[in-house]
């Protein structure tokens, strides 16, 4: 019986991997901490996977220079050990070129609007794990892009983490827990 279940599970993983390869993010908006009016909060009361990209501001000639400057800002001592995700060196190594948009963070949520709100507005002192972008004075002038994949699913807790991992391995966001 266990072997039969294991074989079915292996087949499902294969099908989910193939499904994840077909998924495309829908761009929702660009925003900055100085202008959050572009975020359509009411349209984000959905479940699925979200991606936050950061815009390359054109001041750097290559990715290593850009990431070194970004790392200095992100890892500033005032923001360390504050329940925020870290820069992932193994994912940075997957980026060779400086693109217009750099994948910053990838996550999943049963209510994307609430989770994005936390990533932006959660205070640095709070223990909720989030980007806490608004609290970071040294990156307030950056431009971000929010994209989503809406996935309504009664088996969310089983399926979405697997799909999220596949997308994370494909996109390699530079910040995260994994």
Sequence positions of predicted segments:
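C-terminal or late-domain output modules
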Residues: 126-178
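Surface-exposed loop/turn and secondary-structure junction residues enriched for glycine/proline
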Residues: 19, 115, 119, 123-124, ...
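Surface-exposed polar/charged interaction patches
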Residues: 19-22, 26, 122, 136-139
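GIY-YIG-like beta-to-alpha core
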Residues: 69, 100-135
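GIY-YIG nuclease catalytic motif and its immediate N-terminal context
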Residues: 1-111, 149-163
